[in-house]
């Protein structure tokens, strides 16, 4: 389709991996060029589409949501980015009334959804906005939807993610707004995110009780994650390696709209094959499910690189309808 088709579309999907190590860890020159080109192409497509509303699906990495109360999904009527790593801090331009209206709509459809009136988000949300609209995150109105991707057993299953996306889509059908749905996360990766199985009780406490880390604690975490990425790149890491085959199959499903096949996927196989944090890829599934399923949409932007130093199977994909 021509570029003008983007400008006349009513709904668009952007799947975009995130990595807090972008700009911190070294990346091979050809990989960096590919990432920069993909992000630039996505930014150009998004600005040509000119969304009037954004629905942003993202995970958290124990910066805003903790195990003391961890919902599978949560809509924010107000949201602030904490500014971890190189991501910007500050308030998101949240469409508060529409966020509450979406929650009402989902509840009426028997999809129980949590609501936060003071959501804190990290790079899992803000990096996509930063790359598309700059450090000031001067965006169109946003409805942020958090998705738990780290804390079992409350990680939503595939079919539930698809159902949420369909519910969001039916809500958007009632609005005369050009809407961009962003899934921020994935693809295959297993960064050093602790779990409640960690042997150190202090670590278990840190991921359970809500707290604000000190600047020193943030710096130590950044250095720890940077070292993990370098170890993975050098092949001497305990972390699960990236899985480009899994990633490309996931992107193929997004492109074709054949989402029922993903819903039939064995849940345990996700972590086993693609790493524990590959559950973040479900943000793509929710966003894609708000567009017509079983339909191959126009896809002017698609790029992928497996980059161990970033601990990321890094994919970017833009489609419109």
UniProtKB/Swiss-Prot annotation:
Keywords: Aromatic hydrocarbons catabolism, Dioxygenase, Iron, Oxidoreductase
Source organism, top-level taxon: Bacteria
Molecular function as annotated in GO: 3-carboxyethylcatechol 2,3-dioxygenase activity; ferrous iron binding
Cofactor: Fe(2+)
Catalysed reaction equations from the record: 3-(2,3-dihydroxyphenyl)propanoate + O2 = (2Z,4E)-2-hydroxy-6-oxonona-2,4-dienedioate + H(+); (2E)-3-(2,3-dihydroxyphenyl)prop-2-enoate + O2 = (2Z,4E,7E)-2-hydroxy-6-oxonona-2,4,7-trienedioate + H(+)
EC number: 1.13.11.16
InterPro entries for this protein: DHPP/DHXA_dioxygenase, Xdiol_dOase_suB
Record bears the keyword Iron: yes
Pfam family, one: LigB
Cleavable signal peptide: none
Keyword Ubl conjugation (UniProt): no
Pathway: Aromatic compound metabolism; 3-phenylpropanoate degradation
UniProt GO BP: 3-phenylpropionate catabolic process
NCBIfam families the UniProt entry points to: PRK13370.1-4
Summary of the function given for this chain in its UniProt record: Catalyzes the non-heme iron(II)-dependent oxidative cleavage of 2,3-dihydroxyphenylpropionic acid and 2,3-dihydroxicinnamic acid into 2-hydroxy-6-ketononadienedioate and 2-hydroxy-6-ketononatrienedioate, respectively.
Family to which the UniProt record says this protein belongs: Belongs to the LigB/MhpB extradiol dioxygenase family.
Subunit architecture: Homotetramer.
Protein's UniProt name: 2,3-dihydroxyphenylpropionate/2,3-dihydroxicinnamic acid 1,2-dioxygenase
Organism annotation: Comamonas testosteroni (Pseudomonas testosteroni)
